[in-house]
């Protein structure tokens, strides 16, 4: 876990970017999501924008970490080498130092 925080600090200090993806349902998304997150339900994850480079850091989250784990594996298998499961929405919020908004 400590390494993840160091990696995020490095990204912020160097201006490198990362993408946050909420893989929950639309109803769950509407109850609150991380600021700046994209919404793509886990089973549709390969509809990810071609504007996102395959080497970009991508953090995925859901309610518990289960669906985001599945989506992470799909992205890794598709060549997105830096896809990471950030766990639940609250875990992702802490990990990425990003607030939950309505």
Predicted regions span which residues?
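Sec-dependent signal peptide recognition
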Residues: 1-8
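N-terminal signal peptide c-region/cleavage motif recognized by signal peptidases
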Residues: 12-15
């Amino acid at each position: 876990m400590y390494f993840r925080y160091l990696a995020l600090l490095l990204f912020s200090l160097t201006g490198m970017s990362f993408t946050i993806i909420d893989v929950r349902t639309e109803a769950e998304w509407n109850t609150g999501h991380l600021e700046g997150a994209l919404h793509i339900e886990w089973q549709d994850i390969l509809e990810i924008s071609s504007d996102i480079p395959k080497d970009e850091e991508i953090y995925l989250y859901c309610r518990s970490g289960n669906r985001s784990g599945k989506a992470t594996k799909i992205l890794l298998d598709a060549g997105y080498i830096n896809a990471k499961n950030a766990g639940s929405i609250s875990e992702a919020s802490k990990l990425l130092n990003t607030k939950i908004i309505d």
